[in-house]
């Protein structure tokens, strides 16, 4: 299972939100490039970027930081937040991003997701951000009536690379992942599922391993890394070790 560190960009800085609330912002670094290089040096094999300004306003406020990060790293970088047109998605791909994450447009313009997936095989990801099982859009400000599981089924056959599923209720809380929701999502999806939201300790990461055979192939970690609750290099090593041992025993040893 791939552990993917997250950098959330707001006004060019590296921040984290609590449950997606723009009024509950914690700033961690004013230099996102240095932060990205730090995650790479600790063993990250992929970086997850979120343009929070883009998600909220639909404008590419953080493009300079995104381009600088992409140019500085040797590992693949993926970005979500405010990507709501074909032109914008292709602009990001052309600047070196490995994957582009589409959230709001998956609800509002599903045909656009399908077209981009056909144009760029393996490079389009659908982000499903759910609150009580229903999809939230536009930076989690608007709540739809669409079930997250229905959206997963809809796009599984569209040629997308993966689904990133975020449980809004646990995001930024360090309270642990919503394992039942992840299991249900994986069972509904024919493409790999990447978990996001709630990771607070090493045991939380290990708790995801039983879901790997169902298709949960990665996990995005944010606040737990920034707060020092999880050491990235140790986590990568621990998940590798846990595949060879009883997961429960390893979790007990680390907790």
From Swiss-Prot:
It catalyses: 1-(5-phospho-beta-D-ribosyl)-5-[(5-phospho-beta-D-ribosylamino)methylideneamino]imidazole-4-carboxamide = 5-[(5-phospho-1-deoxy-D-ribulos-1-ylimino)methylamino]-1-(5-phospho-beta-D-ribosyl)imidazole-4-carboxamide. The active site is at residues 8, 129. It comes from the Bacteria. It holds the Pfam family His_biosynth. One of its GO terms (cellular component) is cytoplasm. Its EC number is 5.3.1.16. The keyword Magnesium does not apply. It is found in: Cytoplasm. Pathway: Amino-acid biosynthesis; L-histidine biosynthesis; L-histidine from 5-phospho-alpha-D-ribose 1-diphosphate: step 4/9. Transmembrane segments: none annotated. GO terms for biological process: L-histidine biosynthetic process; L-tryptophan biosynthetic process. Keywords: Amino-acid biosynthesis, Cytoplasm, Histidine biosynthesis, Isomerase. One of its GO terms (molecular function) is 1-(5-phosphoribosyl)-5-[(5-phosphoribosylamino)methylideneamino]imidazole-4-carboxamide isomerase activity. InterPro entries: Aldolase_TIM, His_biosynth, HisA_bact_arch, Isoase_HisA-like, Isoase_HisA-like_bact, RibuloseP-bd_barrel. Belongs to the HisA/HisF family. This is 1-(5-phosphoribosyl)-5-[(5-phosphoribosylamino)methylideneamino] imidazole-4-carboxamide isomerase. It comes from Synechococcus sp. (strain CC9605).
